[in-house]
């Protein structure tokens, strides 16, 4: 049984722009998809319309399992954000956004799951620092 976390950008692209239609069903057949508390929070934060809010609420409601970062994940995320952010010369805003990606990656790693994402750049940087499986979707 292969496990996966879909990154926020996959849901947004699929719901708002009908992206990834050809791969959506195949991904669900290939993986048991688990929800990340971080992804659900990002989706809820960005849901501006009633329809979008309902989609996010439905996703949370039907999720049999929601994976959350542990205190150790938060601790390691701080180190990763500092190290990668310093190397890349990022400002505070970019570092804050990247922290969520680090938390998603660390949660996936702990469960042996693949992160499915359109954010090839940030998860590529993370995969150089920690052992995670990333499936890029374009």
PLM-predicted stretches and their roles:
Residues 29-31, 61-62, 111, 129:
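Structured helix-beta-strand junction loops
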Residues 17-18, 46, 80, 126-130:
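Residue-level signal for well-ordered alpha-helical positions
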Residues 50-54, 84-85, 133-136:
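Short, hinge-like loop/turn segments at secondary-structure boundaries
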Residues 65-114, 118:
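Active-site neighborhoods of divalent-metal-dependent phosphate/nucleic-acid chemistry enzymes
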Residues 10-11, 39, 73, 103-104, ...:
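Alpha-helix capping/helix-boundary segments
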Residues 1-3, 105, 109-138:
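Acidic, PIN/NYN-like endoribonuclease modules and their adjacent C-terminal/linker elements
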Residues 42, 76, 125-126:
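Phosphate- and divalent-cation-binding pockets in alpha/beta enzyme and binding domains
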Residues 1-35, 44-60:
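Short, well-structured N-terminal submotif of metal-dependent ribonuclease cores
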């Amino acid at each position: 049984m292969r496990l996966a976390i879909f990154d926020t950008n996959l849901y947004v692209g699929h719901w708002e722009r009908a992206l990834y239609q050809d791969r959506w069903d195949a991904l669900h057949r290939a993986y048991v998809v688990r929800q990340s508390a971080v992804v659900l929070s990002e989706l809820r934060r960005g849901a501006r319309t009633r329809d979008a809010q309902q989609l996010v609420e439905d996703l949370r409601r039907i999720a049999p399992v929601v994976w959350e970062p542990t205190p150790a994940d938060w601790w390691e995320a701080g180190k990763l954000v500092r190290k990668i952010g310093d190397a890349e010369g990022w400002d505070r805003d970019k570092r804050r956004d990247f922290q969520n990606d680090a938390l998603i990656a660390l949660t996936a790693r702990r469960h042996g799951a693949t992160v499915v994402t359109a954010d090839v750049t940030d998860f590529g940087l993370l995969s150089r620092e920690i052992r995670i499986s990333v499936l890029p979707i374009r």
